[in-house]
């Protein structure tokens, strides 16, 4: 399969109602995969509804009876259509394989700009410095989950920021850590290094509230080489939390003691300084056509983000080691035009005791988790869904390289 064509795997319906419903013509041998389209649709607002089944194998089963009856009727009325897409983190393609050529652009009514710029940007930094918040601001949509806990991001999340004159493709990477406790940690650092290998320039995000430190060691820990040979911008985040005088001192320190091209202070939470970052990136990106259609916000399909939403709710609801011991897999995603989409999710933990904590007394905790997840999933997809959640024990999954590769760490993500 040619890489340029691999980027075109989409099956448009059903899309978010306010977004483009244009379909790209595909060769007949391609397997369709719904790719997230559109921008500025946030998944943080909660709505009320129903449609959750929570069960842990051989441990807990709780079903809302009315909802089950409704779903059975819907199943009879409309047979389920199951899509099992391959979720890929595609490496940076050759520019001759860019997605849209001049003819295709004319067909789609989007003529190529003579000075159009496009390229890849790796976003690096230590855990909990605001990398994901920054990318969400730049893309205009919540793609990466955000919590107050470090090391929330595990995969290399791709976000696409497009305007008529440019296309910026951003890699949100896991936080760079010094000590790798599990095989999972080393696989996440592999994702960081692969992002650098695909990039045209690099953003290194630092916390303005913390004592300034040289980024050479961080680059060496995360990338394996402090001399990466790419333009580097140091993004000093959380400037809203310190006094202007302190910001000036830290800017001076970083400019003096770090080997970066520029330093820009921002507040990713409020979007302050984000336009300055875009301007800097565009000054470094080469001229070239868009790699993706302009209405696509990420190359990951919807089921990937469904799993991330559930994982975010685990981080919010549970404490200490529990969120870090969980792996969320979307086992089944069935799109049903005349009924609610059916989504089956499994949560893997490493110990029986952890499963008990996830479930809670009489299954109350897992039901709360599933309900919160469903509400955000419905808001994200802009449609009602029926969510089933299972909790299973998979001992030492964080040390199992075969499983980690299957779950998408250190390489491609494959649907289960």
Curated annotation (Swiss-Prot):
PROSITE patterns: G_ERA, KH_TYPE_2. Transmembrane segments: none annotated. Its main location: plastid. Residues 237-240 are annotated as: G4. InterPro entries: G_ERA_dom, GTP-bd, GTPase_Era-like, KH_dom-like_a/b, KH_dom_type_2, KH_sf_prok-type, P-loop_NTPase, Small_GTP-bd. SUPFAM superfamilies: P-loop containing nucleoside triphosphate hydrolases, Prokaryotic type KH domain (KH-domain type II). CDD domains: Era, KH-II_Era. Residues 151-155 are annotated as: G2. NCBIfam families: era, PRK00089.1, small_GTP. PANTHER family: GTPASE ERA, GTPASE ERA-LIKE, CHLOROPLASTIC. This is GTPase ERA1, chloroplastic. The gene is ERA1.
């Amino acid at each position: 399969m040619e890489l340029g064509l691999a980027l075109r795997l989409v099956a448009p319906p059903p899309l978010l109602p306010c977004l483009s419903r244009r379909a790209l013509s595909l060769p007949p041998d391609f397997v369709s995969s719904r790719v997230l389209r559109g921008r500025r649709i946030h998944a943080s607002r909660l709505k009320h509804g129903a449609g959750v089944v929570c069960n842990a194998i051989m441990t807990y089963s709780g079903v809302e009876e009315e909802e089950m009856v409704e779903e059975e009727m819907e199943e009879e009325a409309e047979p389920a259509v199951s899509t099992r897409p391959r979720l890929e983190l595609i490496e940076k393609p050759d520019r001759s394989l860019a997605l849209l050529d001049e003819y295709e652009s004319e067909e789609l009514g989007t003529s190529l700009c003579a000075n159009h710029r496009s390229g890849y940007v790796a976003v690096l930094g230590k855990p909990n410095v605001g990398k994901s918040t920054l990318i969400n601001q730049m893309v205009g949509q919540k793609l990466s989950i955000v919590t107050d806990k470090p090391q929330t991001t595990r995969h290399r999340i791709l976000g696409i920021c497009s305007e008529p004159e440019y296309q910026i493709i951003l890699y949100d990477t896991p936080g760079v850590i010094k000590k790798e406790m599990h095989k999972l940690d080393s696989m996440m650092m592999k994702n960081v290094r692969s992002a650098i290998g695909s990039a045209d320039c690099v953003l290194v995000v630092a916390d303005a509230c913390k004592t300034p430190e040289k980024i050479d060691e961080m680059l060496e820990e995360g990338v394996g080489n402090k001399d990466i040979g790419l333009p580097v911008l140091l993004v000093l985040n959380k400037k809203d939390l310190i006094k202007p005088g302190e910001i000036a001192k830290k800017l001076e320190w970083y400019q003096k003691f770090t080997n970066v091209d520029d330093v820009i202070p921002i507040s990713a939470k409020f979007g302050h300084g984000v336009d300055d970052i875009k301007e800097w990136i565009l000054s470094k990106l080469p001229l070239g056509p868009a790699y993706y259609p302009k209405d696509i916000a990420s190359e990951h399909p919807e089921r990937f983000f469904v799993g991330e939403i559930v994982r975010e709710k685990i981080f919010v609801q549970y404490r200490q080691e529990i969120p870090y011991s969980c792996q969320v897999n979307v086992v089944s995603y069935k799109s049903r035009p005349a009924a609610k989409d059916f989504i089956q999710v499994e949560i893997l933990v490493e110990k029986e005791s952890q499963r008990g904590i996830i479930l809670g007394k009489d299954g109350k905790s897992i039901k709360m988790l599933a309900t919160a997840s469903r509400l955000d999933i419905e808001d994200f997809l802009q449609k009602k869904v029926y969510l089933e959640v299972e909790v299973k024990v998979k001992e030492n999954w964080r040390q199992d390289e075969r499983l980690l590769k299957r779950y998408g760490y250190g390489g491609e993500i494959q649907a289960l």
